[in-house]
Amino acid sequence: MSEVAHSTVAFGGHFARELPELAIPWRAEEAPDPQLLTLNQPLAVELGFDPDFLRSPEGVRLLVGNALPEEATPVAQGYSGHQFGWYSPRLGDGRALLLGEIAGADGKLRDVHLKGSGRTPFARNGDGLAAVGPMMREYIVSESMHALNIPTTRSLAVVATGRQVQRETLLPGAVLTRVAGSHLRVGSFQYARASNDMDLLRRLADHAIERHHPSSAGESNRYLALLKGVISVQAKLVAQWMLVGFVHGVMNTDNMTVSGETIDYGPCAFMEGFDPGAVYSSIDEMGRYAYRSQPVVAEWNLARFAESIAALIHEDEEQAVALAVEALNGFRQEYSAAWFSGMQAKLGLPEGIEDDVASPLVDDLLQLVQETRADYTSFFRSLGKAARGEVEPARSQILDLAAFDSWLERWQALNPDADAMDQVNPIYIPRNHLVEEALASATEGDIGPAERLLAAVSHPYSERPGLEKYAEPAPESFGPYRTFCGT
């Protein structure tokens, strides 16, 4: 039985109370020797936690779910999902627990969630555990995404459990404490719809509207408005991924949130040499979730969401389908508008520029960058210098110099805003070789490299002396990069 923790923050049980059909009450496995590896102090303060309490033995036990406030109602959440296109009717939190929700200063609820806390009834054949490396990966990358102003779940802490985890070798175990607007997924709706319980589906949709799309409540068709709201936030989210070269790696429907937050950083990576076909996940053998495919997959996932709530949109099936298809047809326009606006910002182009000027400028540049496999992040950052007249850092990354010089002339004639470019083109991202270096050290008990990498990527747009290694592409000796989900 869990100890009672005297937290400075009250835990609510809104999801568990309102949607008991999707929540199995459960407790985290006892961690033999929990030790705090890293704590996100700014986030802790933002949530109302006392960081000193979270660093105490009692606080650390709270972070692994072994000491909870009396009001906490931890549950494993149920959901379905299409994984690599194949439907799995019963997935759920196999190694995770929702401890409850806490109210932020803005009044919005935030989930506090554990990952790697032990087997649940949804575990299937898994051991329910997680290793230090994958949990530190999610901490580093999610906090980098937050610093890049991309909607994401957050990481509050990583705690080593003192338990060994069997993977290819024995690895030190860990629990990640994750914070999110919610953990409502497309797969949550697939699970509810498959139950044929329309009351449950309606309550789930109303819960999503209240938490993430409150403006939908005032619409004449609130569930159609919910669909449009989720389409909109996902179109903008995936556009932001594409603009920074982020490859999620496992865009299953259970990894698409209705809040529009990025979730699940298992086999993710940041693209270095620009390659639209980039795939990093070791399990994505067919390239389903390649960089260039992410918008297409997002649209496909949203169609599965529309199918799940179609019966709420209209009682007549034909009319429901027609309304849903019309809403889905808006995805490509919203995505394209968000991506193109972001690309114009990356090039420092003035507002109001005509599309027939900006569009070929963008297309021609990306063709040059692709032909050279130039480092995506470094190249766009170097364009800020080119806008100030220092063209060689960018020029040196392109093979077809005559074509690039011609492009430069067209671009510079538009007076690009170098300062604005530096606010959207990062210099520091979680480069894959540095992430692997940090994870290897953390696995061996040295958290220093991870902390230094976090310090760099937490301020991605501000160039600082002494951090040159964090701005450099991987050395050739690093070789082709492959990622693993860690389960």
Swiss-Prot record:
Keyword Transport appears in the UniProt entry: no
Residue numbers binding Mg(2+): 255, 264
InterPro entries per record: SelO
Enzyme Commission number, as recorded: 2.7.7.-, 2.7.7.108
GO molecular function: AMPylase activity; ATP binding; magnesium ion binding
Signal peptide start and end residues: none
NCBIfam families: PRK00029.1
Recorded family membership: Belongs to the SELO family.
Protein name, UniProt field: Protein nucleotidyltransferase YdiU
Organism: Paenarthrobacter aurescens (strain TC1)
Gene designation per UniProt: ydiU
